[in-house]
Amino acid sequence: MEASLKVQAGLAERRDLQVAIAGDLHDQWDRSDEELLLALAPDGLLVVGDLSNGKGRIPRALAQLPLPVACVLGNHDSGHDPTGESLTRQLALLGERHCGWGLRELRPPGLAVVGGRPCTAGGGYHLSKAMRAVYGPVELEESVERICAAALRADPSLPLVLLAHSGPAGLGSQARDPCGRDWKQPACDWGDQDLALAIARIRRHRPVPLVVFGHMHHTLRRGGGERVSFCRDRQGTMYLNTASVPRHGVDLQGRALRHLSW
């Protein structure tokens, strides 16, 4: 999937914006990924979370990349630490690159990235103990308002991307749908309610061309085949699930493979 967004350059000239997107990492990020990015030279990198179960290696590596980065942490990034200390350390390492519940404008190249709720595990709305320890008892409506407020702060001349760990509710209730529950019967819509509500409200003020997320792995459980990873709704919003897991592999000739959505 090529993220072919349009970016304003001066008053009249426009060009395509090339964005690399790293799905759920699950500790699979190393020097080869960094070398690949240097060779591809994208305008920026988006990361949808589940970096490395609360460890600092990957957040530190992302912070040192020589290109614009926006990231939102996933449910595994709490490191099974209910005190929130592990989560706090990762947030500190990522600094302004983490855009959960916030806005990160990448200048250059000229892209407004708004983050969804950090550390979500999907399934409607729920805050883990680690999230409550770090952010307090944020209710559903407040989460919606945080996402909307961040989007409305964005420069209207910049293309807008919503970056989340779990995608929104409303994309289907079958196991193979972009946010469909595949690990337990019956299958159901496992998307985030707050993100879906935020998208609807943001549209009252500006278009939402692209929503990027992960969490729901492409390969379905129990031999269920492959998940639908891309769709477009009637309002023209594109939804891209980037959770190709594992993202490191080898081809039939034994050559290394590294997954990036593009």
Where are these regions (language model features)?
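Active-site-proximal beta-strand elements of phosphoester/diester hydrolases
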Residues: 16-25, 110-124, 161-165, 237-245
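N-terminal active-site segment of His-dependent metallophosphoesterases
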Residues: 1-70, 78-86
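Glycine/small-residue-rich loop that forms an oxyanion/phosphate-binding "nest" at active or ligand-binding sites
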Residues: 81-104
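Active-site-proximal segments of metal-dependent phosphoesterases and phosphodiesterases across multiple
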Residues: 158-207
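Active-site neighborhood of phospho(di)ester-bond hydrolases with catalytic His/Asp-centered motifs
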Residues: 21-24, 45-50, 69-76, 98-101, ...
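Binuclear metal-dependent phosphoesterase catalytic core
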Residues: 2-15, 104-109, 201, 207, ...
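Binuclear metal-dependent hydrolase catalytic cores centered on His/Asp/Glu-rich metal-binding motifs
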Residues: 109-159, 185-191
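Active-site environment of divalent metal-dependent phosphoester hydrolases
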Residues: 26-32, 52-57, 76-83, 105, ...
